[in-house]
Amino acid sequence: MDIIGQVYCFTGAPHTITCLLREQFINWYIKYKRSENYPAFRELVVMYRLFLALGFLTFINAAGQRCRFTDVERDKGYTGMLLKGRLRKTAGNGRTVELICGRGNHNYTCESGVLKESSPRQARCGCKGILEMLFDMPKEERPSPMYDSVTYDPTPNTPTTVGKDGIWNGVDYRNGSTVKPYCDTGPVINGSSKAVCVSGKWVPTLGVCPKMCSIGSLKENGKFVDVTATTKGDELNPPPREQTLIPIVRKVDKDKVQHGVKVVALCKAEDSTTAAEGVQEFECDNGKWKPEPVPCP
């Protein structure tokens, strides 16, 4: 006897199988029990229990054999499921599907109602590390200056290998992770200072590192007696407390100041060798001093 959902099936006459709905089976059972064939029915029940003990009884839940695209897959970063290139909400048992990921779709197989990834590397739709992405670019296409460090939240699992240029290989940041790059040259410009991993991509677009300004060149070009910074770079651009990846070692010239730093410049007075006059104020703007300096007389 097999049970298929709410349908009961059992052997009857030779080479025949009878299937009844649950209510029909109950009525049939009462009627059959009262008949003269009840002893034979008891033998049938014994055989049924024997099949159950041996594992030959099968329960087939047709709906459960299909796989559905659910919040489980959405939480992993996937935005949909493709079956033969078409967007689908369900897939039959044994079918191979593609889960849509911003950095390339992943293959999954429907196994008894559960979507199984084809490889551990495709267990979720995460984002690639920022520094790893930059070092994968041709050298001439990389931004300059580069980020000095990158901080992620939450912190990923510690990778097992270190690749070229000391950058971790194989780190995958889960959907919803945040990233904040840090530049020794000043706050990032021309973009966002923070991004979120959304379906395999960092959004919005991160900004780039600005260029620093030279105090020496300002002093020389403007013929200033003295140039003094009135703000500090660390106040404008506090360094991160935690760094999850190896920072790029950079030697910053003490003559240079960060983007956004303000300075005052003094000209030497004409009637004195020590006094100063003609005070001018400047701000470092991505490698250039603004406003344009007026040279001392």
Swiss-Prot record:
GO molecular function list: DNA binding; interleukin-33 binding
Disulfide bond residue pairs: 183-209
Example of a GO cellular component annotation carried by this entry: host cell nucleus
Glycosylation site positions: 107, 175, 190
Gene that encodes it: ARI
GO terms of biological process kind: regulation of cytokine activity; response to host immune response
Organism: Heligmosomoides polygyrus
UniProt keyword terms in alphabetical order: Disulfide bond, DNA-binding, Glycoprotein, Host nucleus, Secreted, Signal, Sushi
Protein name per its UniProtKB record: Alarmin release inhibitor
InterPro entries, per database record: Sushi/SCR/CCP_sf (IPR035976)
The protein's role, per its UniProt record: Secreted protein which suppresses the host allergic response by inhibiting the interaction of host IL33 with its receptor in order to maintain parasitic infection. Binds to both host IL33 and host nuclear DNA and this dual binding blocks the interaction of IL33 with its receptor, and tethers IL33 within necrotic cells, preventing its release, and blocking allergic response initiation.
Domain of life, per lineage: Eukaryota
Coiled-coil segments: none
SUBUNIT field: Interacts with mouse IL33 (in reduced form).
All copies of domain Sushi, residue ranges: 151-211
Compartment list: Secreted; Host nucleus
